From Swiss-Prot:
Membrane topology (UniProt): Single-pass membrane protein
Keyword terms of this UniProt record: Membrane, Transmembrane, Transmembrane helix
Protein name, as recorded: UPF0154 protein SAG1601
Keyword Transmembrane attached: yes
Organism: Streptococcus agalactiae serotype V (strain ATCC BAA-611 / 2603 V/R)
A single GO cellular-component term on record: plasma membrane
Entry's transmembrane regions: 5-25
Amino acid sequence: MSITIWILLIIVALFGGLVGGIFIARKQIEKEIGEHPRLTPDAIREMMSQMGQKPSEAKVQQTYRNIVKHAKTAIKTKK
């Protein structure tokens, strides 16, 4: 084969690997954020305290569940 064909094959392979890697990384990040949101119950409790609310455990857990539920539905509807 000529050198031009080899160069084209290498460029196509690199481009395909780049595109495939981006999609795989994106899926993994979406899955990780869906399973483990960045806001934890402790962070929610702290935010409620800073806003002047007295954070009861039931309210903190309810807010946390709503955040997790919203994140999962956002990922599902985006597909």
